[in-house]
From Swiss-Prot:
PPR repeat feature ranges: 88-118, 122-156, 157-191, 192-222, 223-257, 258-292, 293-327, 328-358, 359-393, 398-432, 433-467, 468-498, 499-533, 534-569, 570-600
Gene this chain is encoded by: PCMP-E72
Superkingdom as given in the UniProt entry: Eukaryota
Protein name per the record: Putative pentatricopeptide repeat-containing protein At1g17630
Keywords: Repeat
Family: Belongs to the PPR family. PCMP-E subfamily.
Single GO MF annotation: RNA binding
Region (Type E motif): 605-680
Gene3D superfamilies linked to this entry: Tetratricopeptide repeat domain
UniProt xrefs under PROSITE patterns: PPR
């Protein structure tokens, strides 16, 4: 009764806002005070007290109870009426923090801007407003506030500097690393773990792992975050060796790796192509008793796809189910790719169909799986399904999707379809990336489609991809294969950091078009530039020697491969030297090389020797080679037709007819080759038998005119006359 009477009397002199608030707080389910009368009396006593400490605890308690914007603003009103906010930086800081927690950034900023100037020297106030901005992604605002703070002569402390360093990291202001590092040293915070860890995180983002390592070594105290930052930093630099050294050092210092540590180690080895090591470290992670993260599983399954290690992936698949990672899409998508790449597309599709909310990454995983398994029709069907789903669930094909489809068509020899999908991709306003561009340039090189290749080159320049080494190499290859070596050479010379592929592309280009001396010159220049030639480079230069008839130079390169370059000749190299010797008539030497090969000769080697026998009408060697080829390629007609032509050239018509009859008896059919020609930006495809009778009268006079010009040129470098092959031109 006493409390009730007192409440009725004092209610009359408390402002209406505060009365409402008293009732509001008394009804709050989280308050520990059950009696509204007690709350009201306590409230009034606190408001009329001159004890700042009591007021602070009272308002701080109320702020802790606030769950809504209305409640927080009512407490704010009480604080303003008490004038206490102008005396307490701590209370203002707490009020800012509560507003920020509720997402009311404008209210938080309003509190900060209305405090007295005296309180602006309180670092707690600055910390609260900076934290409010950084936690809500307003990084520019945070940096602007920090500049204002510095202009007032204030220096950041161990709470403020980590916030500013985090803002710099997210904004990409990596150039400020050194400035803040100096500031940390000047204000004596170089031993503050939170500050140094944030600085340690910023350096790798700036690509300055050397500075990060020096800072790390100087740290008197480290925690697990310090070690993880360094391992992840080296991982992003593709420096597996350094990442492993830090990882081993961490364990020597008795820090146990956690999920973040293991995931960084796995990612590092995966990015560096050290797939076997990924399996090793994944096993060690499981043996250590650490919980396996979804990210680690995604990396592991991606590596299983690369290694085609389906059996290993299947064992861990059970862990995914038991560990509750089935709904974690990155690991599920990687698992889809594992099954798909191994040809188990039904299992891959089953996993895909189980996903309830499919993102574009899931669609891409299955489409890529179909493409890798050579099931192009299924990939295109799924792509069409995705296009239809776009209208239902707003999942749209991205650059990865389009590139997979374009690549799939190209691999299956459907270059025209690839270009059509590329046009559709452009129409859909999806920007091509470097992988897409390289794929299209490869198609342009194979068709060839020079005009489109030039258009792509223009696109590369406009989109600032001209410094991408993959794109530059693809351009060199495209121009070289299309016969425009002058343009290819210009692109090649413009490459600042040439790699082995750059050199191989230009050497091959010169060689295939008969510029052997230029190809050899570029080969020597490559070696003098410090590059060690690989097998592809040696194939290119040997092929150049073959086309130009440079026998001695070709012999020199071939027989010095092992001693000079540390490379043992492979099938392709043997094919080149056999072709070189065979073209100039050294059939016996070429035949001996084939007989003495350390491995069984494959089709490329035997085919080169058989073709040389055709050139020089050598039936004896040809018969044995054709017999070997028919065993290696029982369903191909090539060796039969070549042997038949050799018999015909030697006047042995009966044997020629017998060979053709044998091919017919085995029901072997010649697969017609196709050719493309580009006229006025339009490509035309034609093959043997595709020309109708009415077009003969137009085509053959032109063909005969070309042959007559070739005959006037006389014999080729290998001593053969074009007239010997006239039957092939008119067949």
């Amino acid at each position: 009764m006493v409390h009730a009477s007192l409440w009725q009397f004092r209610l009359q002199i408390i402002p209406w806002r505060l009365r409402n608030f008293c009732f509001l707080t008394s009804q709050c389910p989280y308050t520990s005070i059950s009696s509204p009368d007690t709350v009201s009396v306590s409230s009034y006593y606190s408001l009329t007290s001159n004890n700042d400490q009591s007021l602070f605890h009272y308002f701080d308690h109320l702020l802790g109870l606030c769950l809504t914007a209305q409640q927080c603003r009512q407490v704010h009103a009480q604080v303003l009426l008490s004038d206490f906010i102008f005396r307490s930086g701590s209370l203002a800081a707490n009020l800012i923090s509560v507003y920020a927690r509720l997402g009311l950034l404008l209210d938080a900023r309003n509190v900060f801007e209305t405090v007295s100037l005296v309180l602006l020297s309180d670092l707690r106030l600055w910390n609260s407003i900076l934290k409010a901005n950084v936690s809500h992604g307003l990084y520019e605002n945070a940096l602007e506030l920090y500049r204002g703070m510095r202009q007032r002569g204030l220096t950041g402390d161990g709470y403020i500097l980590p916030l500013i360093l985090r803002a710099c990291r997210y904004l990409g202001r990596f150039g400020l690393c050194r400035a803040f590092h100096t500031q940390v040293i000047q204000i004596g915070l170089k031993e503050n773990l939170h500050v140094v860890n944030e600085l340690l995180t910023l350096y790798p983002k700036a690509g300055r792992m050397g500075d990060a390592y020096n800072l790390f070594v100087e740290m008197p105290v480290r925690n697990r975050m310090s070690w993880n930052v360094m391992i992840k930093g080296f991982s992003q630099e593709y420096d597996c060796e350094s990442a492993v050294k830090i990882f081993e050092w961490m364990q020597r210092e008795e820090f146990k790796p956690d999920e973040v540590t293991w995931t960084s180690v796995l990612s590092c080895h995966s990015q560096c192509g050290k797939f076997e090591d990924v399996l090793k470290y994944f096993h060690l992670m499981r043996m250590s008793g650490n919980a396996v993260s979804g990210e680690a599983l995604a990396v592991f399954f991606s590596v299983c796809a690369e290694l085609e290690a389906l059996s290993i992936a299947e064992k861990v698949h059970g862990y995914v189910i038991k560990g509750g990672f089935e709904e974690y899409l990155p690991s599920r998508n990687a698992l889809i790719h594992v099954y798909g790449k191994q040809g188990k597309v039904k299992d891959a599709e089953h996993l895909f169909r189980q996903i309830r909310n499919k993102g574009i990454e899931s669609w891409n995983s299955l489409i890529t799986s179909f493409v890798d398994a050579g099931k192009l029709d299924e990939a295109l069907s799924l792509f069409s399904e995705l296009e239809e789903m776009n209208h239902v669930c707003n999942v749209k094909a991205n650059v990865v999707t389009w590139t997979s489809v374009i690549k799939g068509c190209n691999v299956q020899g459907r270059g025209d379809d690839s270009l059509e999908y590329f046009r559709q991709m452009q129409f859909s306003k999806v920007l091509a990336n470097s992988v897409t561009i390289c794929c299209i340039l490869s198609i342009c090189a194979e068709l060839p489609a020079l005009n489109l290749g030039r258009e792509i080159h223009g696109h590369v320049i406009r989109t600032s991809m001209s410094e991408n080494i993959l794109v530059q190499n693809a351009l060199v290859n495209m121009y070289a294969k299309c016969g425009l070596l002058s343009e290819g050479s210009l692109v090649f010379e413009a490459i600042r950091d040439k790699d082995l592929i750059s050199w191989n592309s230009i050497i091959k280009g010169y060689g295939m078009h008969g510029f052997a001396e230029k190809a050899l010159s570029m080969f020597d220049r490559m070696i003098s530039s410090g590059f060690h030639p690989d097998g592809i480079a040696l194939v290119a230069v040997l092929s150049a020697c073959s086309h130009a008839g440079l026998v001695e130079k070709g012999r020199e390169i071939f027989y010095s491969m092992s001693k000079r370059f540390g490379l043992e000749p492979q099938q392709e190299h043997y094919a080149c030297i056999v072709d070189l010797l065979g073209r100039v008539g050294f059939l016996k030497e070429a035949s001996e090389i084939v007989k003495n090969m350390p491995m069984e000769p494959k089709v490329c080697v035997l085919g080169a020797l058989l073709n040389s026998c055709r050139m020089h009408k050598n039936v004896d060697i040809a018969e044995g080679i054709a017999s070997q080829l028919s065993v290696l390629e029982p369903e191909r007609t090539g060796s039969y037709m070549l042997l038949s032509n050799i018999y015909s050239a030697g006047g042995r018509w009966e044997e020629s007819a017998n060979v053709r009859a044998l091919a017919k008896k085995k029901d072997l059919k010649k697969v017609s080759g196709s050719s493309w020609i580009e006229v006025k930006k339009k490509k035309y495809k034609f093959s043997s038998g595709s020309i109708v009778q009415s077009e003969f009268e137009t085509i053959y006079p032109v063909l005969e005119d070309l042959v007559s010009h070739m005959l006037k040129k006389g014999p080729t470098h290998d001593g053969n006359n074009y007239e010997d092959d006239l039957d092939l031109w008119t067949a």
